[in-house]
Amino acid sequence: MCTVIYSSELGQELESIRQTNKDFQKMYPDSLEYPVYDWSNDQTFWSDLEKYIPYIEIINLTGGEPTLVQGNYDFLQKLIDVGVSKNIVITFNTNVTNFQQRFLDIIGHFAKVRLALSIDGTGGVQEYIRFPSKWKAIQNNIQKLLEHVKDANNKFELSFAPAISILNVANFNDYINWSYNIADQHQYDNLVWDMDPSRVHGPEFQDIWHATKEYRQISLTKLKSVQTKSIEFFPSLQNFYNEIITCLESNYHDHAEANRKSLKIWNDSIDKKRRINIKDYIPYSEAIYG
């Protein structure tokens, strides 16, 4: 799940809601629009970074979306031009919404590429949480990436990186199955798969800790249906999976109802701004609120 710290567009959107919505103002009395340092267009930043080129072993690319930042391409090309790229590992998170051919071409020049695939659900769940992403486009981009990896001469580490919240925990079983099917069907000598999920704790009302008993049971039933082989395939998944099961089986928090009311205000406000309805994206949405 992207946050206002990493997305200036989301920050601007939420701030525009806050300014006109009294319920939203009560939840967030202070601005939700964070100051933005335009580092990608700061020539001093890139000039300072170039001084370290002889010593670079691993470089972590950021964004917004790293595949859209021209400065990233320019710097990677410089590493290629000076002949050091074959000794460097590049690592970054991508929302998989935009895989340009130039991106695929340039990463092939590096020793290893570590990509964390920031996809938070399947189908409409992904499209709602990561609005305005399109599920079909994400699937097409993953296929494009895997076709490139298959014929590549360098090594790849691909890790699914969902952020699990009250919105998508009942979709996590489908997510695991979908991820496993992709990984199982695309096993190459130069490719290592993993899943490294995180749990959403903020805003607090999105934490699964505040789920209703009914919604917890729905999520538990689905998660316990996941085959063991699908979980064990990903080295980093088992402990997280157990953590989610334990949380869902625990007694829910005393302030859960109040947090669910805040969640509904949040979702309704964003839906109105975006002219969408959560019911059209998340089939179990009514069970979330209780």
Question: What do the PLM-derived regions correspond to, one by one?
Answer:
Residues 91, 110-116, 136-289:
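Conserved C-terminal portion of the radical SAM core fold
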Residues 39-45, 76-78:
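Eukaryotic beta-rich interaction modules
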Residues 78-84, 148:
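Short, acidic, metal-binding catalytic loop of nucleotide-sugar glycosyltransferases
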